Amino acid sequence: MGIQRGSLYAAFGGKRQLFLEALDRYEERFYRNTLRFLEEGSAREGIRRVFEQVVSDCACAGGTKGCFITNTAVALAEDDPETASRVRSNFRRLEDAFEAALSRAEPPSLQGREPRALARFFTGSLQGLRVLSRCGVPLEVLHDAVEVTLSVLDKPAPQGSEIQKGDPGNG
């Protein structure tokens, strides 16, 4: 192709800038599908589709590459404040998308839980799936994790739970 490493880095202002640009592009690609899934149909179905897409991506990648953003969070965010900020922003964007879908849901489907608390749970669960994938766990384990994760929408929040709808401590 004729592109040398130095000229590639120079085109982006350096190796670090190339990395950050790649991270941004990866995020945008992920959100094109994620937002579409969460905006179409029921909240439950949209959330299922997001999780199934992640499992499908894991299967296509042979289950060992993981997610660029999750891998960045695990490997680099602790030592790099700018990268940590971008990763947190990404996670917050995902959380916001889940919350928007859940906020459109009929109250009975939330089982008495706050949409934001559920969105945080789903965001953490999705990242956990990606870490498991990176470790090479079998797809069966990922599918089981998705089913159990989605089952939270089938069971009422425990009485006295801090994640119950209307709890002021749930910011």
Across the structure, where does each feature detected by a protein language model lie?
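Helix-turn-helix
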Residues: 1-17, 21
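Hydrophobic alpha-helical connector segments
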Residues: 21, 35-65, 115-122
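All-alpha amphipathic helical-bundle segments outside canonical DNA-binding/catalytic cores
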Residues: 41, 85-89, 104-123, 140, ...
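Amphipathic C-terminal alpha-helical segment
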Residues: 57, 122-140, 152-159
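Amphipathic alpha-helical segments used for helix-helix packing
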Residues: 61-82
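Hydrophobic alpha-helical bundle segments that form small-molecule/ligand-binding pockets
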Residues: 79-81, 91-118, 153-165
